[in-house]
Amino acid sequence: MQRMVILGATGSIGSSTLSVIESNPDAYSVYALVANTSVEKMLALCETHRPQIAHMVDGQAAKSLKQRLPTSLNVEITTGEDQLIDIVSASCVDSVMAAIVGAAGLVPTLAAVKAGKRVLLANKESLVMSGRLFIDEMRRSGARVLPVDSEHNAIYQALPESLQSNIGYCELEKAGVSHILLTGSGGPFLTSELASLASMTPAQACKHPNWSMGRKISVDSATMMNKGLEYIEARWLFNAADDQLKVVIHPQSVIHSMVQYLDGSVLAQLGNPDMRTPIAHCMAYPQRIQSGVEPLDFFKVGQLSFSEPDFNRFPCLALAMEACKQGQEATTVVNAANEISVQAFLENKIKFTDIAKVNEACLSQVAPQSLNSIEDIIRLDLQSRTYAAEWVKKI
């Protein structure tokens, strides 16, 4: 029986993880559920899954949950960063699903890595922000990190076992790998007139053609910043050079990514666009379990199409790739700026096309500096958020 902590339990990935657990009740149990402010959802999850601990990042939400949760459930309610670190580090915990969206997931995810846990990494921002610090800590502690993002999970499955067991330090060329091909659907605005993008609403941006996701990641998919962050994450996970990474537009979201080998072979992972598949793969690796996902029907799929990304349409993708070339400071800055600009768009404070403008303005201000600790990263993250917020006000 594998005991799990789910960071971001009330979100999309958290819900999918709990669904996989429900499909395999004899193999997994929930030790702790972690959320930010969603008291109603946490109440329901506690009643269904009976965790030992329910942790709310927001202190007021924790008080509300404590008042409303029946004592008969015998669930301990906690709040505070130190308590969260204790939860992911607990000796009884086998696996941690790291699914808190954004920079907020960095500290608990890194704490799980330091504790040597099996970390199912859905929080791409952790690697985007901390990069080498994260990878080195993983090697020091002996933590096993398994990528949950459908693209990175696909790449992982298409790599030889020798590279799967050496995440962060892969020698791609020695293993015969020539390129990693990251696929992306292009989002809801792939074929929209460029002139119309400025008038796109949050509701339109959040209407992804294939995937069911949260609002922030849905907007990131519409701008393709999500693919840019995944590009950075792939660089760290697979120790890939810029010339070994390519982005491919694939509107059907059936091929989740590919690995191209020196002999001309291309290995791809295919499946229906449902996050329960990569989640189940990570939970059970190296075994396979039921995910609850319908098998892919090739006759219904019919055709698969591919194209190069248009950087005029997707400037955020170009910015993220440029930040990756510049280094750790730049990726930390662009991630922070993007979180602020996307939130401003969702609140109707800026236009869809202003997201890239804010991100570019912040990236242009990156100054050389050393990021030698988590404190350095958090400080730069906060500085970048402040600068991005100022730009939002100017627009």
From Swiss-Prot:
Pfam families in the cross-refs: DXP_redisom_C, DXP_reductoisom, DXPR_C
Transferase keyword on record: no
GO molecular function list: 1-deoxy-D-xylulose-5-phosphate reductoisomerase activity; manganese ion binding; NADPH binding
Enzyme Commission numbers on file: 1.1.1.267
A GO BP entry: isopentenyl diphosphate biosynthetic process, methylerythritol 4-phosphate pathway involved in terpenoid biosynthetic process
Keyword vocabulary terms for this entry: Isoprene biosynthesis, Manganese, Metal-binding, NADP, Oxidoreductase
Cofactor(s) for this UniProt protein: Mg(2+); Mn(2+)
Binding residues for 1-deoxy-D-xylulose 5-phosphate: K124, S150, E151, S185, H208, S221, N226, K227, E230
Annotated pathway: Isoprenoid biosynthesis; isopentenyl diphosphate biosynthesis via DXP pathway; isopentenyl diphosphate from 1-deoxy-D-xylulose 5-phosphate: step 1/6
Binding-site positions, NADPH: T10, G11, S12, I13, N123, E125, G214
Stored PANTHER family: 1-DEOXY-D-XYLULOSE 5-PHOSPHATE REDUCTOISOMERASE, 1-DEOXY-D-XYLULOSE 5-PHOSPHATE REDUCTOISOMERASE, CHLOROPLASTIC
UniProt similarity note: Belongs to the DXR family.
Protein name: 1-deoxy-D-xylulose 5-phosphate reductoisomerase
Native organism: Shewanella sediminis (strain HAW-EB3)
